[in-house]
Regions:
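N-terminal signal peptide c-region/cleavage motif recognized by signal peptidases
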Residues: 18-20
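Small/polar-residue-enriched beta-strand and adjacent coil segments characteristic
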Residues: 27, 65-123, 244-258, 263-328, ...
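Periplasmic alpha-helical coiled-coil/stalk elements that build and connect Gram-negative outer-membrane
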Residues: 3, 10, 26, 124-241, ...
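Short, charged, amphipathic alpha-helical segments
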Residues: 106-110, 173-181, 312, 379-387
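Short flexible linkers and secondary-structure junctions
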Residues: 24-137, 144-149, 155-159, 170-173, ...
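Bacterial Sec-pathway N-terminal export signals of envelope proteins
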Residues: 22-71, 86, 95-98, 104, ...
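Amphipathic alpha-helical coiled-coil segments
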Residues: 44-56, 123, 127-148, 157-159, ...
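Sec-dependent N-terminal signal peptides
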Residues: 8-16
C-alpha cells in the first residue's frame, strides 16, 4: 500500500513539473502568432519567396552590351602612319530581342514567384494546423492526467472503506484487492498521460521556434466550436481559393509561358554592332576616320536539339502540373468532406457525453455511495460506478481532443480561422 502511495506522489510531482501552475498561461492564438513569426521552416519559405521574386527581373533583362577596343590592320613594325587602313577602333555590340522571348521569360518567372508565394501561404496554414493539434494534445493530456488524479482519490476512498470493513470482519478481501489493483492501474494511466503531454509540448515548442525545455507555460482551454452543418461553403472556398491549388495553377502558367518563350527564341534576335576607327596622318596627309555598322541574326539550324526540345520539356511539365492540379482538387474535396463529417460526429459525441453520459454517471456514483452507506448495496457496486465514471470522463476528453484535431486539419484545408472562432495571424511574407 505504501509503495502505491509513493508512486502516486512521484507521478503527481511529474505532472506538476509538466504543467507549472505559476507560469504565465499561453493561449492558442498567442501560440499561432509565435509560429507565424519565429518558426524556422516559415523563415526558410520566406527566403525562397524572396529568391523567386529576385529571379523575375533578370529573366526578362536584355543581355549586357559588349564594348570592343583594339587596333586594325597594323603592320608588323607596329607603326600607325604607314598604311591607310591602319586604325585604332572602338565599337559596341548589342543583342536586341525583338520578338518577345524575354517578355515571356519574365512572365514565366513571375508565375514561379506566385507559386512560391502560394506555397508560403500553404506552409503557414499547415503549421498553424500542426500547432493547434499539438496544443490540443498537450492540453487534453494534462486534463486526462488531472482526471486520473481525481479518480485515484476516489480509489483511495474505496480502499479505505474496503479495508475498514475487512478489518471489522464485515467485508471481503476481494474488495480490498480489487480497489488496490485499480489504484495501481490509475498510476499507469497517469504516467502515460504525463508522457503524452510532454511529447505534445515538445512538438508545440518546436513549431513555435523554441527549445523543448523553454515551453513552461500553462495552457488555456483551446477554443471549442461546432463545425457548420453544410460542408458546401467550405468545399466551394477550397476549390476556389486554396493556396495549394493557386500554387499549382501558377506552376501550370509558369511552364506554359516557358514553353512559349523557348519556341519564341527560334525567331531570330538581332545582333547590332557599331564601330568607329581613328586613322593617323600618313606622310603629313590627314586621313578621314571610318565607321562601320552591322546587323546579324541567328539561323535556327539546330533548333530541334535545343529550343524545341526545351519547349517540349516545358509542355510536358505543364501537363504534369495540370494533372497534379486535378489530383489536388479531388484530394482537397475528399479531405474537406471527410474531416467535416468526422468533426460533426465528434461534436455530437462531445455534446452527448458532456450533457448526458458523464453527468448521469456522476449521479450514479453519488447514488451508489448513498446506497452503500445505507447498507442497501455492497462496495463492489460503488467500485463499478466509479470505474465507469472514470472511463466516460476519459472518453469525453478523447472526444474533445479528436474534435480539436479534426478542426485543426480543417483549418489547413480551409485557411479560415473564423470558422473556428480564431483570428489567424497575418502571414509574414518577408524577413524585412
Amino acid at each position: 500500500m505504501r509503495s502505491v502511495v509513493s508512486r502516486g506522489a512521484v507521478a503527481l510531482a511529474a505532472l506538476l513539473a509538466v504543467v507549472p501552475h505559476g507560469a504565465i498561461a499561453l493561449d492558442l492564438q498567442a501560440a499561432l502568432r509565435e509560429v507565424a513569426t519565429t518558426n524556422p521552416t516559415l523563415a526558410s519559405r520566406r527566403a525562397m519567396v524572396e529568391a523567386a521574386r529576385r529571379r523575375v527581373a533578370p529573366a526578362g533583362a536584355w543581355q549586357s552590351p559588349m564594348v570592343e577596343i583594339g587596333a586594325l590592320n597594323v603592320p608588323t613594325n607596329g607603326r600607325f602612319d604607314m598604311e591607310p587602313m591602319t586604325m585604332k577602333m572602338v565599337g559596341i555590340e548589342q543583342r536586341v530581342p525583338v520578338f518577345g522571348a524575354n517578355r515571356l521569360s519574365r512572365r514565366s518567372a513571375g508565375a514561379a514567384a506566385q507559386a512560391e508565394g502560394a506555397g508560403l501561404e500553404m506552409a503557414n496554414y499547415e503549421l498553424f494546423s500542426m500547432a493547434w493539434e499539438a496544443y490540443a494534445d498537450a492540453y487534453y493530456a494534462g486534463q486526462l492526467a488531472e482526471s486520473s488524479l481525481a479518480h485515484r482519490g476516489e480509489m483511495e476512498r474505496l480502499v479505505r472503506s474496503a479495508r475498514a470493513r475487512y478489518d471489522s470482519g464485515n467485508g471481503r478481501l476481494e474488495d480490498v484487492l480489487r480497489a488496490e489493483a485499480e489504484q495501481a492501474r490509475i498510476l499507469s494511466d497517469l504516467a502515460a498521460f504525463e508522457s503524452e503531454a510532454q511529447g505534445a509540448r515538445a512538438r508545440l515548442a518546436a513549431l513555435m521556434g523554441r527549445e523543448s525545455a523553454a515551453l513552461a507555460d500553462s495552457l488555456e482551454t483551446p477554443p471549442v466550436s461546432s463545425p457548420p452543418e453544410d460542408p458546401a461553403a467550405i468545399i466551394a472556398w477550397v476549390n476556389e481559393s486554396h493556396p495549394r491549388l493557386r500554387a499549382l495553377r501558377a506552376q501550370v502558367d509558369r511552364y506554359q509561358l516557358a514553353a512559349r518563350a523557348a519556341r519564341r527564341m527560334i525567331w531570330p534576335d538581332l545582333n547590332m554592332s557599331v564601330s568607329y576607327g581613328i586613322r593617323q596622318p600618313i606622310m603629313g596627309v590627314a586621313q578621314d576616320n571610318m565607321w562601320s555598322a552591322t546587323v546579324g541574326f541567328m539561323l535556327p539550324v539546330f533548333a530541334n536539339q535545343r529550343e524545341l526540345s526545351e519547349a517540349s520539356e516545358m509542355d510536358a511539365m505543364a501537363r504534369a502540373s495540370e494533372s497534379d492540379l486535378r489530383a489536388a482538387t479531388l484530394d482537397l474535396d475528399q479531405q474537406a468532406r471527410s474531416l467535416h463529417a468526422s468533426a460533426r460526429a465528434d461534436s455530437r459525441t462531445v455534446s452527448l457525453l458532456a450533457d448526458t453520459v458523464v453527468t448521469t454517471q456522476r449521479r450514479a456514483v453519488a447514488a451508489s455511495w448513498s446506497a452503500y452507506k445505507a447498507g442497501a448495496t455492497d462496495l463492489w457496486r460503488v467500485f463499478e460506478a466509479t470505474h465507469a465514471l472514470y472511463g466516460e470522463e476519459v472518453a469525453l476528453m478523447r472526444a474533445r481532443q479528436d474534435l480539436a484535431r479534426n478542426e485543426a486539419r480543417l483549418l489547413a484545408i480551409t485557411a479560415r480561422g473564423d470558422l473556428f472562432g480564431l483570428t489567424l495571424p497575418e502571414i509574414k511574407r518577408s524577413e524585412r
